[in-house]
Amino acid sequence: NGVTEEVGWEFKRLNCNNIMIITDENLIDHISVTKTIKSIEQNNLNPILFSEVSVEPTDSSFKKAIEFAVTNNINGFVGVGGGSSMDTAKAANLYSTYPADFMTYVNAPIGKGTPVPGKLKPMIAIPTTTGTGSETTGTAVFDYEEMNAKTAIAHRELRPLIGLIDPENVRTIPPNVVACSGLDVLCHGLESYTAIPFHTRNKPETPSLRPSYQGSNPISDIWSLTAVKMVAKNIYNAVNDPDNHEARSQMLLAVTYAGIGFGNAGCHLCHGMS
């Protein structure tokens, strides 16, 4: 509990000074954001707030964040919120570090699918929902408006350097959100466990072309199955008893476990249909 308070220390250790805090307008006064700002200031660093994250990010909303990062000479990123905030932070980090036409890094066949050239600037993820697991993945999902299609940018270098998993940030989530996001966690675990096995896929021409999602494998299976068991044990109490902090803490941990699982193995039918 309370690990959000360490975010400023982490950025100072990483030699960052201009820190872009990416969140949405509904979280500006939430404890997760106020603690993040305070911690950065206490470490004599410069917090720069960007609160224009879209609930469902689009290429346009990503471009706003990218322009903001470039204009403000950002050298450290922290995504505070759900998957939308964290994915927006990944995109802002990528394109401000390696500027390119927007479609360059977008997954083929919609985009060019060009591999990320190298390391990005330090990014820390602070999740405030018990759902997406974006703090563990190298994927930034968005709606491509021109085609009315959901796609993503996916590469291992997009993974946040640090995830601060703080139960205090999920204590006030409405029960219906805990329920819906909890089913997302369940799908992450089940889909990654039943994904096409890694050994049935063709070897890429070079390691740089290896996809972010490898298929089910013995290591991701451990994380995925553990997450499913944690959801089964805790989701009822997390939804129906908001004061059951242990149940909500376990759901938040399950999110991260499932994220490590599907962040390596990938998802399939449910997420593909959505």
Q: Model-found features: residue ranges?
A:
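N-terminal amphipathic/basic leader segments beginning at the initiator methionine
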Residues: 1-14
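Predominant activation on well-ordered alpha-helical scaffold segments within soluble catalytic domains
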Residues: 8, 37, 48, 63-66, ...
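Conserved beta-strand elements of the Class I
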Residues: 20-21, 76-78, 124
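N-terminal small/polar loop signature for handling phosphorylated ligands or for N-terminal nucleophile
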Residues: 28-102, 236-248
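A glycine/threonine-rich phosphate-anchoring loop and its flanking beta-alpha core
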Residues: 98-212
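Active-site segments that bind and position negatively charged phosphate/pyrophosphate groups
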Residues: 198-274
